[in-house]
């Protein structure tokens, strides 16, 4: 596989942004060690926006010959008040539920979970020189920049927060350098931390990423955030500015169960959630069901996706590209209910191996039902 083919795998859906493609090409060309990482807070159940979007990209990175790592951010979750802010509970959930759920998600998206290294944050944070790296980074970042970066925790600028939360962005940047990560991966909502990492990379004294004497900047790969299924707070959306603002607010959320499908959901739960989903006829600009079709079903094109309909409504129709389906929907040739039903059946089939695993091994879900899920 040549360099351009490897770059195309990194750029493949659901990737929305690579900072920068030129730097990625440079890392391939000089033969730098390619170490990927994606970090997760440990909170509630894993939904498709976490499991499938991250799992899909991990599969792509593996195909491109990049070492993959999932970072279980227990301390970060504690700082951000997840699972009642109980560090021991967070660690138990990380190892007994989250790790297993991500392994299964990676597998259904075509990756090899056995080739993914899972690292608990506390394994490295308890080493003294980690904090040296945090301070080194902090000396190169202004307080106002840190304040603007708290949105990576799902917090609003201006929100009353405890001081520990100001340390969080610097820890997230330190995680990259301390682990020798050359490819930092996350959803688009983590962009601010990754931009800081790129900007400070060549200023660091402790744990810079060095290859043959060259201080390297990490590459940041940001995947699409799946939209939640709920109706936006304002509809219709009139201006482009409103559209961007609402789209950023309406990502899938585990705290809004009907906005999300979870990886262990039963067939009936999936059908029910899709049936209630916001999916206005002919609306292709803001439509969560179409969003899922584009980034889950048509991640690879061409692919065959069949919508089953009674003969009196036109009979079955098979699409091979997202644009074909989108055009039919915009023209009113594809009814929202038919699309919802087809997406539900696709997801039921895709998630079947995960569902079967948790039916045979109920302990992780029993653990989740016993803990206090906050935020």
Swiss-Prot record:
Its main location: cytoplasm. A motif ('KMSKS' region) lies at residues 251-255. The keyword Iron-sulfur does not apply. ATP binds at residue 254. It catalyses: tRNA(Tyr) + L-tyrosine + ATP = L-tyrosyl-tRNA(Tyr) + AMP + diphosphate + H(+). Its EC number is 6.1.1.1. One of its GO terms (molecular function) is ATP binding. It is found in: Cytoplasm. One of its GO terms (biological process) is tyrosyl-tRNA aminoacylation. It is an enzyme of class 6 (ligase). L-tyrosine binds at residues 37, 168, 172, 175, 190. GO terms for cellular component: cytoplasm. Keywords: Aminoacyl-tRNA synthetase, ATP-binding, Cytoplasm, Ligase, Nucleotide-binding, Protein biosynthesis. Pfam families: tRNA-synt_1b (PF00579). The keyword Signal does not apply. It comes from the Archaea. Homodimer. NCBIfam families: PRK08560.1 (NF006330). HAMAP family: Tyr_tRNA_synth_type4 (MF_02009). Belongs to the class-I aminoacyl-tRNA synthetase family. TyrS type 4 subfamily. Catalyzes the attachment of tyrosine to tRNA(Tyr) in a two-step reaction: tyrosine is first activated by ATP to form Tyr-AMP and then transferred to the acceptor end of tRNA(Tyr). This is Tyrosine--tRNA ligase. It comes from Pyrococcus horikoshii (strain ATCC 700860 / DSM 12428 / JCM 9974 / NBRC 100139 / OT-3).
């Amino acid at each position: 596989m040549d360099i351009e083919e490897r770059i195309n795998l990194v750029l493949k859906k659901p990737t929305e942004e690579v900072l920068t493609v030129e730097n990625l090409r440079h890392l391939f060309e000089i033969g730098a060690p390619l170490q990927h990482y994606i970090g997760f807070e440990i909170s509630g159940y894993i939904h498709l926006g976490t499991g499938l979007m991250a799992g899909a990209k991990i599969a792509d990175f593996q195909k491109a010959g990049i070492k993959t790592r999932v970072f279980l951010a227990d301390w970060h979750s504690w700082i951000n008040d997840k699972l009642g802010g109980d560090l021991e509970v967070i660690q138990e959930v990380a190892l007994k539920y989250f790790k297993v759920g991500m392994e299964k998600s990676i597998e259904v998206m075509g990756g090899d979970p056995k080739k993914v290294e899972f690292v608990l944050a506390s394994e490295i944070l308890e080493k003294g020189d980690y904090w040296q790296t945090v301070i080194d980074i902090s000396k190169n970042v202004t307080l106002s920049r840190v304040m603007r970066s708290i949105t990576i925790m799902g917090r609003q600028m201006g929100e009353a927060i405890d001081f520990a939360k100001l340390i969080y962005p610097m820890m997230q940047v330190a995680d990259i350098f301390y682990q020798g990560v050359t490819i930092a991966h996350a959803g688009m909502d983590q962009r601010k931390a990754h931009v800081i990492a790129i900007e400070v990379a060549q200023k660091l004294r402790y744990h810079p990423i060095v290859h043959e004497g060259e201080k390297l900047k990490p590459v940041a790969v940001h995947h699409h955030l799946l939209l939640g299924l709920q109706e936006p707070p304002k509809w219709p959306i009139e201006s482009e500015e409103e559209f961007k603002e609402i789209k950023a607010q309406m990502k899938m959320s585990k705290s809004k169960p009907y906005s999300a499908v979870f990886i262990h959901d039963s067939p009936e739960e999936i059908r029910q959630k899709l049936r209630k989903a916001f999916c206005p006829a002919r609306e292709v600009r803001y439509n969560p069901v179409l969003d899922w079709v584009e980034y889950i079903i048509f991640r690879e094109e061409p692919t065959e996706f069949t919508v089953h309909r009674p003969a009196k409504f036109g009979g079955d129709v098979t699409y091979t590209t997202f644009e074909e389906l989108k055009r039919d929907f915009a023209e009113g040739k594809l009814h929202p209910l038919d699309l919802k039903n087809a997406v539900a059946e696709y997801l039921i089939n895709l998630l079947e191996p995960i569902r079967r695993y948790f039916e045979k091994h109920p302990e992780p879900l029993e653990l989740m039902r016993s803990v206090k899920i906050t935020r």
